[in-house]
Design a protein with these regions (language model features):
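N-terminal lobe of the biotin/lipoate ligase/transferase fold
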Residues: 1-98
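Flexible, glycine/proline-enriched loop segments at strand-loop-helix junctions
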Residues: 6-9, 92-100, 148-150, 185-193
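Contiguous, small/hydrophobic- and glycine-enriched helical/loop subdomains that border
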Residues: 83-124
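A short beta-strand motif that forms the metal-chelation/ATP-contact edge
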Residues: 128-137, 253
Length: 300
């Protein structure tokens, strides 16, 4: 197993770009790669999810967290310094598709050695005492395949629940929806490791990551550029959201690819927003010099 040196970055967009770079350019013909990283507080959506359905609007409005989207499917996850993310990148094989046990069993075994009663459930999550400690997803380009997941060690579970809680108004979309689960932190199940960095170092050893991949400056610059140009862009984070209908008191809004496609309100003033990005600051800016500025609270 070859450990990927991510230069100890906690920038979620950079770590997401590293994963895509390895999928597209990694030589997995003679080695498998392991990427371990700890992100700054963020919410990460699956590739095919609607951001408006998955994330609580209070958080969307106040921008309290970085919002991200990964290249794999699956559900939305919250990450912070109390969460360790792991990614296995290997050469593609049909037998690896949805074979989460192949990738996750070594992680489960490692956790059990430190006293965490970890098992895999029928949804391919890793659970402990009936509660979820790890969600997982996969992506392949038929050259390489990535199977990656989260490990809740000492995350802010109140923040997790608040930013992912359902809104108190109707949000409809045919996008893939997250399956909400009870969660727990592993720190409550082991006294052998005291912090997330300790878990990271332990997994390096137990998973036998005995060689290191270091990116050249040219490769690193390409990764950082991809993080800025793609993974941090409105088009990727918001724009990949499928058609979503938001129904609030006295107003109905249709949003597709992050853009207001239609809006129904008792006044005609709201229709000026058709074609506007459905994002709080964009709508606020569009309404600043309008008689309909009081619409802002109704719309977002």
């Amino acid at each position: 197993m070859t450990l990927v040196d991510n230069r100890n970055t906690s920038e979620p967009y950079v770590n997401l770009a590293i994963e895509e770079f390895l999928i597209r350019h990694g030589d997995c013909s003679h080695q498998d790669f392991l990427l371990l990283y700890i992100n700054q507080p963020c919410v990460v959506l699956g590739k095919n999810q609607s951001i408006y359905k998955e994330v609580n609007f209070e958080f969307l409005r106040n921008k309290q967290l970085q919002l991200c989207r990964r290249i794999s499917g699956g559900g939305t996850v919250y990450q912070d310094k109390g969460n360790l993310s792991f990614s296995f990148i290997s050469q593609f094989s049909e037998s690896k598709i949805n074979n989460y046990r192949l990738f996750n069993q070594p992680v489960v075994d490692a956790l059990r050695k430190i006293g965490v009663d970890a098992v895999m459930d029928e949804r391919n999550n890793i659970i402990c005492k009936g509660k979820k400690i790890s969600g997982n997803a996969q992506f392949t380009n038929r050259k390489n395949i990535i199977s990656h997941g989260t490990l809740l060690f000492d995350a802010d579970l109140n923040l997790l629940r608040n930013c992912l809680k359902e809104n108190d108004f109707k949000v409809e979309s045919k996008a893939v929806s997250s399956v909400r689960s009870s969660v727990m932190n592993m720190k409550d199940a082991t006294d052998k490791i005291s912090h997330t960095e300790g878990l990271k170092e332990y997994l390096k050893r137990d998973l036998k990551a005995d060689s290191i991949l270091q990116f050249t400056e040219e490769e690193w610059n390409a990764i950082v550029k991809s993080a800025a140009d793609k993974f941090k862009s409105f088009e990727w984070i918001y724009g990949r959201s499928p058609l979503t209908t938001i129904t609030k008191p006295d107003i109905e809004i249709e949003v597709e690819e992050g853009i207001i496609k239609d809006i129904r309100h008792k006044t005609q003033d709201a229709r000026q927003l058709i074609g506007t990005k459905y994002e709080f600051n964009e709508i606020k800016k569009a309404l600043e010099n309008s008689k309909a500025c009081d619409l802002l609270k109704s719309i977002f």
